[in-house]
Amino acid sequence: MDISASPSIADGPVYTHQTVRLDSGLDLECGVHLAPLEVAYCTYGTLSPARDNAILVCHALTGDQYLAERNPLTGKPGWWSRMVGPGLPIDTDRYFVVCSNVLGGCMGTTGPRSICAETGKAWDSEFPPITMHDIVAAQAKLIDHLGIDRLFAVIGGSMGGMQALTWAADFPDRVFAAMPIATSPFHSAQNIAFNEVSRQAIFADPDWHDGHYRDFGAIPARGLGVARMMAHITYLSEEALSRKFGRRVRHDAATAVPASSSPSLFGEMFEVESYLRHQGSSFVRRFDANSYLTITRAMDYFDLAAEHDGDLANPFRKSQTRFCVVSFSSDWLFPTSQSRLLVRALNRAGANVSFVEIESDRGHDAFLLEEPDFDRTIRGFIAGAAEHAALKAGER
């Protein structure tokens, strides 16, 4: 087992970035034994002597382990730096926070870019199919490695919320509290459809090369960029788009988008067009197309009820976890109706569950943005859970 570590105090809370190599590997649900297993992760704060103050934060589809410090690849602040840190709702002065790159990702955890032990070459598009259960099983191996028997909390938004629910279902004795945010216990037909259009955009790119594009010194940038553009629309709301862009045009269209983007064929470019092109072009510089395909498919497979005789209550009947389910009023990707369905199932299972719908016009991405009511909800739930757990947070 090899570990590389790099502690830092720059641009955020004190953290350590590590990659752990587990030679024992991981048995995937598809039947493939994946070995070795590498998991890249960051930790923030200090684990208490009782090892009872650990919070696992799970990232969304295109997130990574750089939760609260400057991302070394993009140079931008961590994706939840406004939420995680000293004195913030997820307080690193009190809690030991862990965030790992998911299985199938492209930021250090085993995924399509990794070398297949049998062939000596990168997996690329031949990386085996994975599920949300596989993703969580890899995280569980990391938590075992850290010597943590029970997580105080698992928190995640969007696909991160799917992971939080899977933790509570698959490890009912290892999670005291769970906060699934802007998520669902299944991936809807609409969301599967969005993902399929994204995948087809990648497949249609002439640089796709059946997923072995790196052998040709290429990446399917056009297709992956279009996939990101379309996905980004689903993360916003009509109100947010109207407020941010309206029907305004860019009079400097020639310099408004990177040179690699196709020029507008119809005169001046709308600001929303320029914005989407920027999102697409910046995304392809940091994310791998095969990882995008692998992870979106894992999301599509996700359906906790179908795996338990069609009854969503069944996976939680043995769970001792305390839940706080959070939705946002303008989120049409994971609408409040799906959160209510989850809450009703948790009630049937006899779980301790609270539900909060945050009024916001910012759409699905609201959980990543400044929302005072949401901040108070997270802070309050964590404090209440700590009280019920008799957690002596801050005594380290």
Swiss-Prot record:
One GO term of the biological process aspect: methionine biosynthetic process
EC number: 2.3.1.31
Catalytic activity: L-homoserine + acetyl-CoA = O-acetyl-L-homoserine + CoA
Localization per Swiss-Prot or TrEMBL: Cytoplasm
Organism name: Gluconobacter oxydans (strain 621H)
Binding-site residues, substrate: R228, D365
Record keywords, A-Z: Acyltransferase, Amino-acid biosynthesis, Cytoplasm, Methionine biosynthesis, Transferase
Family: Belongs to the AB hydrolase superfamily. MetX family.
Task performed by this protein: Transfers an acetyl group from acetyl-CoA to L-homoserine, forming acetyl-L-homoserine.
Alphabetized InterPro entries for the sequence: AB_hydrolase_1, AB_hydrolase_fold, HAT_MetX-like
GO CC, any one term: cytoplasm
Name under which the protein is recorded: Homoserine O-acetyltransferase
Subunit field text: Homodimer.
Pfam families: Abhydrolase_1
Pathway noted in the entry: Amino-acid biosynthesis; L-methionine biosynthesis via de novo pathway; O-acetyl-L-homoserine from L-homoserine: step 1/1
Residues covered by the AB hydrolase-1 domain: 53-370
Active site annotation, chain numbering: S158 (nucleophile), D331, H364
Entry's Gene Ontology molecular function annotations: homoserine O-acetyltransferase activity
